[in-house]
Amino acid sequence: MKPPILFTILLTVISGTMIVLMSSHWLMIWIGFEMNTLAIIPILMKKSNPRAIEASTKYFLTQATASMILMMGITINLMYSGQWTMSKTLCPMASTMMTIALAMKLGLAPFHFWVPEVTQGVHMSSGLILLTWQKIAPLLVLYQISPTIDPNLLLPMAMMSVLIGGWGGLNQTQLRKILAYSSIAHMGWMATITLYNPTMMLLNLTIYIIMTLTTFMLFMHNSTTTTLSLSQTWNKTPLVTSLILMLMLSLGGLPPLSGFIPKWMIIQELTKNEMIIMPTLLAITALLNLYFYMRLTYTTTLTMFPSTNNMKMKWKFDNTKKMILLPPLTVISTMLLPITPLLSILD
């Protein structure tokens, strides 16, 4: 893809999200979602091969269905309220339909089936955009309508997402699929806390985006796509491989890394709201995510695959990929836990 065309498409993707963020008119929000969806398709098909085309088609059909349900919810709300403006009060049917549409866009269970397949079928850079930037607009619309959402609808979806995000990643060897299932689990955590402390959801989203962005950038730096290729990078770039594994543990929520902050604060907030069963189940299912990340770290560091090259001297070319943002992003993704007391302002 030529640079001017790529720049125009990326600008349209960014513009679509910004329109959603800055609008209080439901029609403009819907138009922003449509701009974003139509512009991301060429990015997903950047590497023209059958798998990328299949993934783009799956993504388009899912997002088009979600947009149709969202427009139906907007129309029903217009019939009841007589206004297009986003307000704190929505009729129950419109709120339910909008919640389902946003859950489809986010990949919450049981609408999660497209996330691993699409992420695996596209290029690593396209997967990065898919799992980070594309989550911002739906989550912030969910944030704005959170007072009207029925907890009996959103909480079961959130709980299923955390559970499926943990189970799905257990038998994966493809790194993109592992990150996709991790994304489903993180969306479940964010959906849970949206009902009780929406501001904390924004903190969770920020930390998730930083960790996922850094992980994808390190994968692209090392050109790794599977657990086998990751284990073979010790001889080439031992420092980068160590950072990748540390980031994996942070994504799993292992203390004292940054990924532990949102889980800690969400469980604390749910407990303050006199909920016992939900935080207990979330903490138990979060162990599934932590398990497959720790297993990946263990197999990469303490065991050797048969095809791993153990030579002390190895032909090595200088890496021409210069990523200036990697050092600060890596520090933020792993060492934010000491600032947690400062976040008491969210209470």
UniProtKB/Swiss-Prot annotation:
GO biological process: mitochondrial electron transport, NADH to ubiquinone
Membrane-crossing segments per the record: 3-23, 25-45, 59-79, 96-116, 122-142, 149-169, 178-198, 200-220, 242-262, 274-294, 323-343
EC class: translocase
InterPro entries reported in the protein's UniProt record: Complex_I_Subunit_2, NADH_DH_su2_C, NADH_UbQ_OxRdtase_chain2, ND/Mrp_TM
MF terms in GO: NADH dehydrogenase (ubiquinone) activity
Membrane topology per record: Multi-pass membrane protein
Enzyme Commission number(s) of this protein: 7.1.1.2
Any single Pfam family the record assigns to this protein: Proton_antipo_M
UniProt main location, coarse: mitochondrion
Catalytic activity as recorded in UniProt: a ubiquinone + NADH + 5 H(+)(in) = a ubiquinol + NAD(+) + 4 H(+)(out)
Keywords carried by this UniProt record: Electron transport, Membrane, Mitochondrion, Mitochondrion inner membrane, NAD, Respiratory chain, Translocase, Transmembrane, Transmembrane helix, Transport, Ubiquinone
Domain of life: Eukaryota
Intracellular or extracellular location(s): Mitochondrion inner membrane
Cellular component terms (Gene Ontology): mitochondrial inner membrane
Role description: Core subunit of the mitochondrial membrane respiratory chain NADH dehydrogenase (Complex I) that is believed to belong to the minimal assembly required for catalysis. Complex I functions in the transfer of electrons from NADH to the respiratory chain. The immediate electron acceptor for the enzyme is believed to be ubiquinone.
Similarity-based family: Belongs to the complex I subunit 2 family.
PANTHER family reported in the protein's UniProt record: NADH-UBIQUINONE OXIDOREDUCTASE CHAIN 2
Oligomeric and partner information: Core subunit of respiratory chain NADH dehydrogenase (Complex I) which is composed of 45 different subunits. Interacts with TMEM242.
Protein name: NADH-ubiquinone oxidoreductase chain 2
Organism this protein belongs to: Suricata suricatta (Meerkat)
